[in-house]
């Protein structure tokens, strides 16, 4: 190894002090590098089953965040199995080691989104065949519930992700009566997992407030920092907006749907202009 070679070099040659100091620094650096490589090599590589009702190239935050998560896990050497609904468009940005596809139905009032049918036997066999170390359920819909039961039947630990406040969404679709039942279901669901990943401290506090008692872990959403980088800033684009370098630009990136409350953003923008 490089570190031991440097040590031998010290013993064999009578270097002047400046060179000895340099070689000593290099020796320490090489030892740290070797330890880092060794630690990385010894890290366990997991087999992870990820269950989701939505997946890229569907346009929503859950699908985008999950794609970045899967890419990152795979890059670290973990093996990924995806259990998800059949899609109309195929994702070309990521290839899981295994996939289990179930039938899908469109979500009411969300024609471009769908949920997975609870095909228990198919999901259970897929999990048994892959034999994952953990099953991570991203969405709490019919497919997520099916995977929860299947994983428990095979005595495999289940973690979950809390991405969407479905209980809050209900009030935007004349479904206010469903807020409490949905809240109760979400509480039950996450309390039957070994831990739940949340995107922020605010979400963590909200889940604790309505009774989620399983361990909650804050996990930030994945961002492609190469694609989204200040070096891509375009003065030509700002000129088309009639904005110079000192102009404050308020930008919304996301779907246009009632629960996004884009009207609040527009009103905020108008209030800012008045100041």
Regions found by a protein language model. Give the residues of each.
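An amphipathic, basic-hydrophobic alpha-helix
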Residues: 108-137, 143-149, 153, 180, ...
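Donor nucleotide-sugar binding/catalytic pocket of nucleotide-sugar-dependent glycosyltransferases
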Residues: 84, 100-103, 183-233, 243
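Nucleotide-sugar donor phosphate/pyrophosphate-binding loop at the beta->alpha transition
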Residues: 157-159, 168-188
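N-terminal subdomain of nucleotide-sugar transferases
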Residues: 2-103
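Short hydrophobic "strand-cap" motifs at the C-terminus of beta-strands
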Residues: 51, 199, 252-254
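Nucleotide-sugar donor-binding and catalytic loop/hinge architecture
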Residues: 37-46, 232-249
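Conserved donor-binding/catalytic core segment of Leloir-type glycosyltransferases
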Residues: 244-260, 266-270
């Amino acid at each position: 190894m490089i570190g031991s070679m440097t040590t031998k070099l010290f013993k064999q040659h009578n270097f002047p002090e400046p060179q000895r100091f340099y070689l000593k620094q290099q020796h320490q650096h090489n030892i740290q590098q070797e330890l880092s490589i060794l630690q990385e090599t010894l890290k366990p590589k997991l087999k992870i089953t990820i269950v989701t009702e939505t997946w890229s190239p569907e346009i929503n935050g859950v699908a985008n965040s999950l794609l970045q998560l899967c890419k990152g896990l795979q890059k670290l050497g973990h093996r990924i199995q995806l259990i998800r609904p059949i899609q109309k468009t195929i994702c070309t940005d990521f290839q899981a080691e295994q996939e289990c596809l179930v039938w899908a139905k469109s979500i009411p009032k969300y024609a471009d989104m769908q949920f997975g049918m609870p095909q228990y036997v198919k999901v259970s066999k897929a999990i048994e065949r892959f034999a994952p170390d953990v099953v991570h359920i991203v969405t709490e819909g019919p497919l997520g519930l099916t995977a929860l039961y299947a994983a428990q039947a095979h005595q495999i630990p289940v973690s979950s992700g809390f991405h969407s406040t479905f209980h809050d969404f209900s009030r935007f679709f004349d479904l206010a009566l469903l807020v409490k039942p949905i809240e109760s279901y979400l509480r039950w669901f996450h309390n039957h997992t070994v831990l739940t990943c949340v995107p922020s401290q605010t979400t963590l506090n909200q889940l604790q407030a309505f009774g989620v008692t399983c361990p909650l872990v804050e996990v930030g959403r994945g961002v492609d920092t190469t694609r989204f980088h200040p070096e891509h800033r375009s003065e030509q684009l700002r000129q088309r907006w009639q904005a110079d370098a000192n102009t404050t630009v308020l930008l919304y990136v996301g779907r246009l749907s009632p629960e996004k409350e884009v009207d609040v953003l527009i009103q905020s923008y108008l209030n800012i202009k008045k100041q």
